[in-house]
């Protein structure tokens, strides 16, 4: 698993929002100001079309903790078929590391990857060590219960509002019901198509 040396709070400040690295309370405590990272905290100015495309791409990559090579590969896989912003988000939301995080079995996508790589996650009752594995509707996901004990104090209420997942949290069990059809970033279809022109 690759590591990022930059601090997560800098990513959030750069994008101007919480990228789910922190709880809202902790994010407000850490962010302190709306200034972007820099020597003197440069304020945001007018963004060009290219800058908007770049910021959109960076935000998606940071949100799902993926790197340029992997993102580019995903982009061209999706572009072979009819492509729109929902297709891209659906693809990323189907990743096993993301679903483990959505189930609140981990406090971050990075921790999800650790759980998966160390063999503590099962898909349809078979061990799966591939964080980028794409789930299909009806897939059953289970996790080694010993890793749930430290999660009881975590904000479990988030999962109650995710209608495309079924979760029995304290049994370490969940089902991927359907595709999310969520547009988390209000993406413009034409803007996304221009990323790798």
From Swiss-Prot:
Pfam families: Ribosomal_S4, S4. Residues 94-158 form the S4 RNA-binding domain. GO terms for biological process: ribosomal small subunit biogenesis. SUPFAM superfamilies: Alpha-L RNA-binding motif. One of its GO terms (cellular component) is small ribosomal subunit. Keywords: Ribonucleoprotein, Ribosomal protein, RNA-binding, rRNA-binding. It comes from the Bacteria. GO terms for molecular function: rRNA binding; structural constituent of ribosome. Part of the 30S ribosomal subunit. Contacts protein S5. The interaction surface between S4 and S5 is involved in control of translational fidelity. PANTHER family: 30S 40S RIBOSOMAL PROTEIN, SMALL RIBOSOMAL SUBUNIT PROTEIN US4M. Belongs to the universal ribosomal protein uS4 family. One of the primary rRNA binding proteins, it binds directly to 16S rRNA where it nucleates assembly of the body of the 30S subunit. This is Small ribosomal subunit protein uS4. It comes from Carsonella ruddii (strain PV).
């Amino acid at each position: 698993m690759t590591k990022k040396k930059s601090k997560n709070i800098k990513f959030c400040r750069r994008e101007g929002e919480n990228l789910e690295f922190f709880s809202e309370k902790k994010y407000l405590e850490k962010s302190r100001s709306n200034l972007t990272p820099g020597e003197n905290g440069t304020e945001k100015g007018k963004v060009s079309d290219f800058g908007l495309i770049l910021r959109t791409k960076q935000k998606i990559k940071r949100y799902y903790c993926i790197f340029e090579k992997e993102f580019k590969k995903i982009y061209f896989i999706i572009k072979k078929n009819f492509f729109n912003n929902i297709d891209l988000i659906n693809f990323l939301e189907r990743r096993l590391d993301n679903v483990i995080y959505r189930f609140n079995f981990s406090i971050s996508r990075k921790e999800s990857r650790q759980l998966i790589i160390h063999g503590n996650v099962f898909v349809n009752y078979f061990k799966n060590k591939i964080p980028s594995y794409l789930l299909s509707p009806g897939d059953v996901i289970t996790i080694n219960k010993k890793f749930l004990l430290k999660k009881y104090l975590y904000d479990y209420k988030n999962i109650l509002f995710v209608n495309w997942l079924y979760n029995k949290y304290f049994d370490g069990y969940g089902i991927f019901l359907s595709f999310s059809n969520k547009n988390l970033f209000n993406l413009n279809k034409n803007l996304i198509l221009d990323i790798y022109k």
